[in-house]
A protein has these predicted regions:
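Acidic, low-complexity intrinsically disordered segments
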Residues: 2-213
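Flexible glycine/acidic-rich beta-alpha junction loops that bind and position SAM and/or redox cofactors
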Residues: 19, 77, 110-115, 196, ...
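Terminal RNA-binding accessory module
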Residues: 418-512
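Alpha-helical interaction/regulatory segments in DNA maintenance proteins
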Residues: 539, 555-576
C-alpha cells in the first residue's frame, strides 16, 4: 500500500465471508470494490489497506478525509491466507482515529455486532445497515449520514469502477493467487420461507445482473491483471434468472442466461480459473431437465476442481421442518446423482471437473442425538451407492434463537465423518500417484500464513529442498491442502504427485526434480526411501562427481547406492 501525501480516505478491507460471498484472501470481495468504486467515481483520493497489511504496517489515521471499515465475515471458517477483522480491532481503529475524521463501518459483521449490543459512542461515526457503498456515496454528495441502498445504475457503475480500483490494482495477491469474486445476483429465491439461520433470504427477491454487465466488469478486471474469477452472490447457481421466482415453490431454472454468462467469460483467453459456489438440491431435483442442461454447461466452462456447495444442513425431517431448510434427503440424492453423472471426469489440473460439496449445521432447532445418526445413515448410503462428494463441511449454527449443542454428540459425529468419509473420499478421488498441477505454496511449518512468510528469504530459491514442511493449495474454490515434507519457495507454483493422505489434506512431492540436484530431504519425501536410503543416494552421487561421473537415470543411481527403486510410485515422474 502506498500512502498519499494529501488528505485522503482510508479504506480498510476487513474481509467478508457470507453464505454467498467470499472476500478473505486470496479472494477480493465485491463489496470492498464497490466502496472503492464510489471514491473512484467521485475522483477522490484514497488508500486501500487489507487488514492483514494493517496489522503488520498500519497506515496513518491522521490527515484523512474519512475512514471506511468493511467487516463482513459471518460464516465460521478456518482461514489460511488471511484473517478477518475482529470486533476488538475494529474498536481500536475507531479509537485511534482523530475525532474530527468521519468513520463509516459496514458489512454483515458490523450488523451482527450491533445486534449483539455493540453501540460505540463517537461523533462522526456511522454504522451502515444497508449498502455501505451507497451510504458513502450519499455522504459524499450530501455531507450527511443516512442508510441507503444502491440503484441498479449505481450497481453497474461501482462494479465497473471497482474492477479497476486500488482494491484490485494494489492487492497484495494480484500477481499471485488473487481470485476475483464477482456478484452475479443478490437475494434468494426462498426469500419467503428461507433457512432460518441464513442472512440471504433477508436480502429479499433476487435481483439479477445481466450477463453482459458481469462480463464487462470481469473484462475490466482482466485489464488490471486479474486471472482467476469466482461467480459469487448466488445462493443457487441454477436459479440465475430463473422463471417463476415469485409464484413457484421451486422456480424453473433457465439454462440460456447462465450459459451466455459462462461462455462469455470463458471466451476471454485471459481467464484462467473459473469457479462457482452454491447449488440448491431441491431446485435441481424438481427440475431435472433444465438442471441437466445447466450442469453440462458448468462442466464445459468451469475449471476442474469446481464445487457446488449443497446446503442440506440436516437429514433429520424434524430439523428440516423446524428450520425451513431448502432440501430433503431424497432431493439431495437426486441432485448428487446428476452432478456425478457429468462431473466426475478429471480435468487438466488433475481434479474432477465438478463435484458436490455437502454442508451440515449443528445446533438447529429440533436437533437430537438421533439427528446425527440420521445424518450418518445418509452419508453411508451415498458412499455405498458410489456417489463422489468433494467435501463434507460441518459447522455450528451462529446467532440467537437456536438450541444448545450437545458437545459429545457433535464431536462424535465430526470424528466419524472425518474417519469414514473425508479420508476415504480423498483416497478415492486422488490416489497415490495422481499428478496435480499448479499448486501454489503459501506457508512453511504451519498451515496458516504468518508475517514471516512474507519475508524475501521465505520466497528465495535458496530454501528449496531444505528441511521443513511446506503447505500450499491449487487456486480455486475449496482447494485441497497439500503438505510437502521439505521447503519450497513460497508464492510459487509446482506440479506435484500425491504420496499420501490425511483426513482433509494430502501429502505430495514435486515432479521433475533433477537427478543432479535433488536433496536428501526431497529424496526422503519419496515413499519407499528412508532417511538412511536418502543419505546413501546423496553419498553415492557425491562419490560419482568426484570421479567426474554422472548418473544418467534413477535405475543406475539406485543400483550404485545398493537400493531398490520404489515400486509404489512412478519414480521417473519425480526424478528426471
Amino acid at each position: 500500500m502506498s500512502e498519499t501525501q494529501e488528505a485522503s480516505w482510508l479504506i480498510i478491507d476487513g474481509y467478508e465471508d457470507e453464505p454467498a460471498a467470499f472476500g478473505v484472501p486470496p479472494y477480493v470481495g465485491f463489496h470492498i470494490r464497490y466502496i472503492c468504486g464510489v471514491l473512484e467515481k467521485h475522483n477522490i483520493d484514497y488508500d486501500y489497506c487489507p487488514i492483514d497489511t494493517y496489522r503488520i504496517n498500519p497506515p496513518s489515521l491522521g490527515n484523512r478525509l474519512g475512514v471506511v471499515i468493511l467487516a463482513g465475515a459471518i460464516v465460521p471458517g478456518k482461514y489460511l491466507r488471511g484473517t478477518p477483522i475482529s470486533l476488538r480491532e475494529t474498536r481500536e481503529v475507531i479509537a485511534n482515529t482523530p475525532g474530527e475524521i468521519p468513520v463509516l463501518c459496514g458489512g454483515w459483521a458490523i450488523r451482527g455486532w450491533r445486534h449483539q449490543g455493540w453501540s460505540p459512542l463517537r461523533k462522526n461515526l456511522f454504522l451502515a445497515l444497508q449498502d455501505t457503498d451507497a451510504t458513502l456515496d450519499h455522504f459524499l454528495r450530501r455531507n450527511e449520514w443516512k442508510h441507503q441502498r444502491r440503484t441498479a445504475e449505481q450497481w453497474t457503475d461501482w462494479a465497473q469502477t471497482g474492477a479497476k480500483s486500488k482494491a484490485v490494482t494494489e492487492n497484495p495477491d494480484l500477481n499471485g493467487p488473487l481470485t476475483y469474486e464477482v456478484e452475479v445476483y443478490q437475494g434468494c429465491v426462498r426469500y419467503k420461507r428461507g433457512c432460518k439461520f441464513c442472512i440471504e433470504p433477508k436480502k429479499g427477491v433476487p435481483i439479477w445482473r445481466s450477463p453482459e454487465d458481469i462480463i464487462r466488469e470481469v473484462s475490466i478486471a482482466h485489464d488490471m491483471g486479474v486471472k482467476h474469477v469466482r461467480l459469487g452472490g448466488m445462493t443457487d447457481t441454477y436459479t440465475y434468472m430463473a422463471e417463476g421466482v415469485v409464484e413457484l415453490e421451486y422456480p424453473k431454472p433457465n439454462p440460456e442466461p447462465i450459459a451466455k454468462l459462462l461462455h462469455g467469460l470463458r471466451d476471454d483467453e485471459r481467464l484462467e480459473i473459473l469457479h462457482t459456489d452454491n447449488g440448491n438440491p431441491s431446485i435441481i431435483a424438481e427440475n431435472m431437465e433444465e438442471s441437466e442442461e445447466i450442469t453440462k454447461t458448468l462442466v464445459q466452462t468451469l475449471s476442474d476442481g469446481a464445487v457446488l456447495s449443497f446446503g442440506l444442513e440436516s437429514a433429520d425431517p424434524n430439523v428440516h421442518e423446524a428450520n425451513w431448510l431448502n432440501c430433503d434427503a431424497t432431493q439431495l440424492k437426486s441432485a448428487i446423482s446428476l452432478i456425478n453423472k457429468y462431473g466426475r471426469e478429471k480435468g487438466d489440473r488433475g481434479l474432477p471437473k465438478l463435484l458436490p460439496g455437502l454442508n451440515f449445521i449443528a445446533g438447529l432447532n429440533g436437533e437430537t442425538s438421533n439427528t446425527y445418526d440420521i445424518n450418518l445413515a445418509l452419508l453411508r448410503e451415498l458412499k455405498q451407492e458410489g456417489h463422489m462428494i468433494r467435501r463434507v463441511n460441518i459447522r455450528q449454527v451462529e446467532g440467537e434463537g437456536f438450541q444448545e449443542i450437545d458437545e459429545t454428540d457433535f464431536q462424535s459425529f465430526k470424528k466419524t465423518v472425518r474417519d469414514e468419509f473425508d479420508g476415504p473420499i480423498l483416497e478415492e478421488m486422488l490416489p497415490v500417484g495422481t499428478v496435480l498441477s499448479d499448486v501454489w505454496w503459501e506457508s512453511h511449518e504451519g498451515r496458516t500464513r504468518l508475517p514471516r512468510h512474507l519475508e524475501p528469504k521465505a520466497r528465495s530459491i535458496e530454501v528449496h529442498g531444505k528441511a521443513g514442511i511446506t503447505f500450499g493449495r491449487q487456486i480455486g474454490a475449496y482447494p485441497i491442502l497439500v503438505g510437502m515434507n521439505y521447503l519450497a519457495p513460497l508464492e510459487s507454483y509446482s506440479e506435484i504427485i500425491v504420496t499420501g493422505h490425511g483426513a482433509r489434506s494430502i501429502t505430495g512431492i514435486e515432479t521433475g526434480l533433477s537427478i543432479d540436484t535433488i536433496t536428501e530431504k526431497q529424496l526422503s519425501a519419496i515413499p519407499g526411501i528412508s532417511s538412511k536410503g536418502a543419505w546413501s543416494l546423496v553419498s553415492s552421487r557425491a562419490k560419482a562427481r568426484a570421479k567426474n561421473k554422472i548418473f544418467e537415470n534413477p535405475d543406475d543411481w539406485f543400483d550404485a547406492s545398493g537400493l531398490q527403486v520404489p515400486d509404489t510410485i512412478d519414480i521417473l515422474k519425480i526424478i528426471s
